[in-house]
Amino acid sequence: MATEYWSRHLRSVLAPLFAAAGTYSPEDQESHLAFIDEHIAPNLGPLPWEPHGPYSTPSSLVGSPFDPSINIVSSGKAKVRFDFDVISPPDRTGPDPFAEGSAREILHRLADLVGADTQWMGYLMDALYLTPAEAEVAKTKLPPGVAIPPSSVGFDFDGPERTLKFYIPSVRKALATGQDVSELMLKTLRGLQPLGSELVPAMDLIASYLSTRTNDAMLPLVGIDCLDPRTHKNARVKCYLHTSSNSFAVVRDVLTLGGRLSDDTSLKRVETLKSVWPLLINELEGPQSDAATMDESWSKPERLNRTGYSGIQYTIEITPGQAIPDTKIYVPLFQYTDSSEVAERNFESALKKLGNEWGLSGKYRSVMQEIFKDVENYGQTYASFSYTEGKGVYTTSYVAMPIKDEGGGSLAGDFGFRN
């Protein structure tokens, strides 16, 4: 029954996204949806009104454990993606209180299905999952309201291909062992194999920045592409940074690693983002509405403070042999308006300003209105932004179908990394 429920929930968003993207043949769409029915729906846990560990994805804002998204490059080409958290037990009891054993089983099974490489994933699991003794310590130190998934699972869909992505936090291990969250993650990443030595120059930049930054940026999470880096030189290690402040001065500082990234691409990335910043934070009137003259030191008050999704998230994306990393920002649109319609309109205006076909033609809002036509206020959760010389500007829209059975849903309250 739960699998059938989750299959309907997943299809309600993903089927129209695949159709709208314009990059998937009918055969691709049918294959991907069948894969989702058979291998993703069974892993979303019990029915939402039955006992389960807290949902901690941004989609928990509307009661869902599942984060669908659509990535749109400057040419208008689009790719569908999604991620979900491995669901923990409701009461942290039993032999697998934090679902780390379950996460190992789920991820290795999915890796086998799609032919993914597990070398980096296996190393990170061994380094950051808890020993039995550490699990006992974590149970006493972690307050019940803290939601830290053991891992998150993601998939990118490129034509007929499916690429597995794996995400793992260092927060629980740091708490259980008394280590600093960022230092533990950096130490762990320095031992990554294979090709860990080729990641060191970019890792050194991140470590240097975190040791001298004037804001509170920290590194609680890492994500990887489950590809063999020896044959896929574009395999990424994505270092997720978080800041409490949402001022553009802090954004600029993080995206350039305190000025360490001063190449033309990094600087253009920041200035292009600045041109649409007022739209992303819903500042359409007043002094902060003009990107050219706005006060970069100003932080906008948030709707929902003290949540796991307050402030701003970033990724510093490193690949073997590349000394200069790419940087990306994730803006929580829901923090700046309680209306999905307003967030949707602002995001399309940003696409239009960036010259993206999905904005210029009105396609973005048309697709959203078709998917969520029966929903009064859906989850417009995040927008990500980056720029590279090869891709140009590329953005991702993260959306979520509400689960009404959850009574409206509530955003995950605390991930523990600021405690």
UniProtKB/Swiss-Prot annotation:
Where on this chain does substrate bind? Answer: R81, K165, Y167, R236, K238, Y240, Y330, Y394
InterPro entries given for it? Aro_prenylTrfase, Aro_prenylTrfase_DMATS
Write out the catalysed reaction.
didemethylasterriquinone D + dimethylallyl diphosphate = asterriquinone C1 + diphosphate
Pathway it works in: Secondary metabolite biosynthesis
Per the UniProt record, which EC number(s) apply here? 2.5.1.-
Q: Name one GO biological process term.
A: terrequinone A biosynthetic process
Recorded GO molecular functions are: prenyltransferase activity
This entry's comment on induction and repression of expression is: Specifically expressed at both asexual stages. Expression is positively regulated by the secondary metabolism regulator laeA. Expression is also positively regulated by mpkB. Expression is also positively regulated by mtfA.
Question: In the UniProt record for this chain, what is stated about the effect of gene disruption?
Answer: Impairs the production of terrequinone A.
Which parts of the sequence bind L-tryptophan? Answer: P58, S59
Give the residue range of the signal peptide. none
Per the record, a Pfam family?
Trp_DMAT
Per UniProt, the keywords (alphabetical) are:
Transferase
According to the lineage, what is the superkingdom?
Eukaryota
Q: What does this protein do?
A: Indole prenyltransferase; part of the gene cluster that mediates the biosynthesis of terrequinone A, an antitumor agent. The first step in the biosynthetic pathway for terrequinone A is formation of indole pyruvic acid (IPA) from L-tryptophan by the aminotransferase tdiD. The nonribosomal peptide synthase tdiA then immediately converts unstable IPA to didemethylasterriquinone D (DDAQ D), via condensation of 2 IPA molecules. The symmetric connectivity of the 2 IPA molecules is thought to arise by head-to-tail dual Claisen condensations facilitated by the TE domain.
The family annotation for this protein states: Belongs to the tryptophan dimethylallyltransferase family.
What's the protein name?
Indole prenyltransferase tdiB
Q: Which classification does the entry list for the species?
A: Eukaryota, Fungi, Dikarya, Ascomycota, Pezizomycotina
